Amino acid sequence: MDLEKLKDYQKHIRNFSIVAHVDHGKSTIADRILELTDTVSKRQLKNQMLDDMPLERQRGITIKMNSVQVKYHANDGEDYIFHLIDTPGHVDFSYEVSRSLAACEGAVLVVDASQGVQAQTLSNTYLALENDLEILPVLNKIDLPSADPDMAKSEIGDMLGLDASDAVEVSGKTGAGIPELLERIVTDISAPTGDLTKPLKALIFDSKYDDYRGVVMSVRIEEGTVKPGDEIMIMNTGKKYEVTEVGVSSPHPVKEDILIAGDVGYITANIKSVRETRVGDTITSAENPTAEALPGYRQIPPMVYSGMYPTDNRDYDDLKEALQKLQLNDASLEFEPETSQALGFGFRCGFLGLLHMDVVQERLEQEFDLDLIMTAPSVDYHAIMPTGEVKLIDNPADLPDAGEYKELQEPYVKAEIMVPNDFVGAVMQLCEGKRGEFQTMDYLDKYRVNVIYEMPLAEIIYDFFDQLKSSTKGYASLDYEIIGYKATNLVKIDILLNKEPIDALSFIAHREEARDRAVQMCSLLKKLIPRQNFQVDIQGAIGSKIISRATIKPYRKDVTWKIHTGDPDRRAKLLEKQKRGKKRMKSVGRVEVPQDAFMAVLRMNDDDINGK
């Protein structure tokens, strides 16, 4: 292909992401676009076409961003190439949204016409503006009886500062308005401007391992061109490879002769390990490298930590390998080996939130056939030592004794909660109960308020979201960001089973709530741990002080059933023998603790603690 033809082809490329609050219908709109442009035949089309991970289809959510090339014949008679990137809407996966926006020139901002602007709509709009993207507002679900397009348009104008007077009105369900949306993508989103004559510069935004082709890198070409046979270099490692195949996803892989600046596609180069291709790295030409790498992605620190252990210690190496494979295309997952007296060898893993943790656990169990025990999640604390050294504590069991550190700090977040006026009181009551500090309140319109609190991350990660939804009948939406660490009065609570501390059950709580939480934990464990042949004493302790206890009574085996009546000596002898046996069993017998018990801390909601 000559340069002029390639430049003309580039003018017809449109790269855009579909962003929205969770459940506003991004994936459904993506399905309709694929259907209308005949990218996928009606026979092959299924709901959530781009959500190709089984777990995504099972849960009905988008977890990983996905790109697809769509060919569109526009009303001006020209053929256009769309690269559509579908993104997650859940706050845990906002890093996936920021990654996908870096590969685009425009964003289709989907707003549910019946619900209007929600918390994630706001944060995704800010992400798009940070990336200097053209934003195209779209109102979805206009076929619903409760849809109010005028209300949604005025909210987009007032709250986001975008002109929504001519926002496209569509229905992802019926396909109404999708043709107009496709035309607006052509006219409103600009073509990529990368220089084709410069050295190759491409951003890796995802990578996965294929048994036949090695590592498949999903890339956005910023400058230059790449074709099979070219020698490329990954700038971060300096390693060089020969390109074996380039292509696009449509939505299944389609080989191409060349990828040019502006294209979103894939490259394979016989790379054996995904660790050599970190997400956010820059690919360039080995012979004529570009001067500087692309900015890549900021590393998102984990918000939540949890211990992950195989139920059978022989699976340790399999778990390590599985985590390494997952980490390759989930850059936000962190893990390091750890040992627990109760659970043996495992890993301390860092996640972006509880949904992310659930998803990783389910993927490991489904895709790698592993049986896992997860310990209760915790945040990372800062213990300030007398020397001034800051010790990071991501596992409550590692917290030094109270006298050994000067103060303990925990991460705080700024939480923005959008809520209808009627529920403001309930939201404020909930936040105050979670140690929240009120900051401000913005009235967005006659009906809705944005309530802003600063509160400990530890209070949000457990069941805050569920409680928020139930106290506002599902109308509230939440967005939060870490703002730093604050010193608070925290203590570590150890749980002892038969006087043995179980490190995996330790947790950190505010001193004022410590006793209530310890009592709650003991009574929960009493329900969850099955009865044994010996008595199990459950105790909660701060240091050496026991603050709560519960007892699981043993099974009583009737050892006297075969004695004839009237032989009290024989009876007493057998009961004494049973007692001795139980005593021995108690000293050697390990209490069997089920998985539910390790997650019990999640179920200690405040109503239970307050005895309601």
Curated annotation (Swiss-Prot):
Gene Ontology biological process terms in this record: positive regulation of translation
Single Gene Ontology MF annotation: ribosome binding
Repeat as UniProt keyword: no
Protein localization: Cell membrane
Domain of life where this protein originates: Bacteria
Membrane association type: Peripheral membrane protein
Stored Gene3D superfamilies: 3.30.70.240, Elongation factor 4, C-terminal domain, Elongation Factor G (Translational Gtpase), domain 3, P-loop containing nucleotide triphosphate hydrolases, Translation factors
GO cellular component, one term: plasma membrane
Enzyme nomenclature, EC number: 3.6.5.n1
Keywords: Cell membrane, GTP-binding, Hydrolase, Membrane, Nucleotide-binding, Protein biosynthesis
Presence of keyword Protein biosynthesis: yes
SUPFAM superfamilies: EF-G C-terminal domain-like, P-loop containing nucleoside triphosphate hydrolases, Translation proteins
Catalytically driven reaction(s): GTP + H2O = GDP + phosphate + H(+)
Residues annotated as binding GTP: D23, H24, G25, K26, S27, T28, N140, K141, I142, D143
Major site of localization recorded for this protein: membrane
EC class (word): hydrolase
Family, as annotated: Belongs to the TRAFAC class translation factor GTPase superfamily. Classic translation factor GTPase family. LepA subfamily.
UniProt function note: Required for accurate and efficient protein synthesis under certain stress conditions. May act as a fidelity factor of the translation reaction, by catalyzing a one-codon backward translocation of tRNAs on improperly translocated ribosomes. Back-translocation proceeds from a post-translocation (POST) complex to a pre-translocation (PRE) complex, thus giving elongation factor G a second chance to translocate the tRNAs correctly. Binds to ribosomes in a GTP-dependent manner.
HAMAP family in the record: LepA (MF_00071)
Protein name: Elongation factor 4
Species per Swiss-Prot/TrEMBL record: Lactobacillus delbrueckii subsp. bulgaricus (strain ATCC 11842 / DSM 20081 / BCRC 10696 / JCM 1002 / NBRC 13953 / NCIMB 11778 / NCTC 12712 / WDCM 00102 / Lb 14)
Gene: lepA
